[in-house]
């Protein structure tokens, strides 16, 4: 398998693709057989996206009361959790959080809102005004994640200065009905297409540990490749009390790393960032993500869970002798 991986890595670097059957075979690797896979993923990453690390941060700009019933989400109105509930924060707070993210070393800053979609009118206008100020007053690049959007909303975001729209598929098409039944998978796919058509870059990934099979993780990766998204955030479930998945078992650190490596082989040219749940699932192996094909990570807090201190992540990067990208392009 080592020689096969070397040849597969060379094929991908030369512009070839990994076949679904090959990805499924690599998903069966265990133990020390994973190390050549990580090596191949790391070489592919360095060839296509370089060795600098991309850092991003987010603000939970509107929390709770979401009508969707996503099984993992603490903000769903269908669950009883301790997640905070509040309406859209004011413009000043969005800008202040952008400054804090920039201070912590992030080059990208996402404004995230709960709910199926953002309300047109005052809410969208407030976000657009904040984006304009962030553009003027900071050096950080703003992005938005406002749920399902149409062309009108996408165009308004472009006009305000948003470069990237974030919208996760969460899981594969075949597993999605087990995760959410309040909207259709195709609505999420269409949002990605709407954003791209409007001229936005798209950040789109998912979350692992929902009960999906390894084959379904690979299925999602190929869907992302078909959609030609620009960057791929990978999350690992951190079970929240009160949600349907509160008793779900965490994925093992090596399984997390194997998943990252497979996504790198399937999506060789994309920025792959490791976000929510990395502390809980990867534990002492968090630093290994960069040797398994990841090219970025989220620092600071997540939507409803706490991340580790930015200083710890910076120390990790220093210990690894990795430099940080100065922009999120």
UniProtKB/Swiss-Prot annotation:
It catalyses: (4R,5S)-dethiobiotin + (sulfur carrier)-SH + 2 reduced [2Fe-2S]-[ferredoxin] + 2 S-adenosyl-L-methionine = (sulfur carrier)-H + biotin + 2 5'-deoxyadenosine + 2 L-methionine + 2 oxidized [2Fe-2S]-[ferredoxin]. Binds 1 [4Fe-4S] cluster. The cluster is coordinated with 3 cysteines and an exchangeable S-adenosyl-L-methionine. It is an enzyme of class 2 (transferase). CDD domains: Radical_SAM (cd01335). SUPFAM superfamilies: Radical SAM enzymes. Residues 48-278 form the Radical SAM core domain. Its EC number is 2.8.1.6. Belongs to the radical SAM superfamily. Biotin synthase family. Homodimer. This is Biotin synthase. It comes from Geotalea daltonii (strain DSM 22248 / JCM 15807 / FRC-32) (Geobacter daltonii).
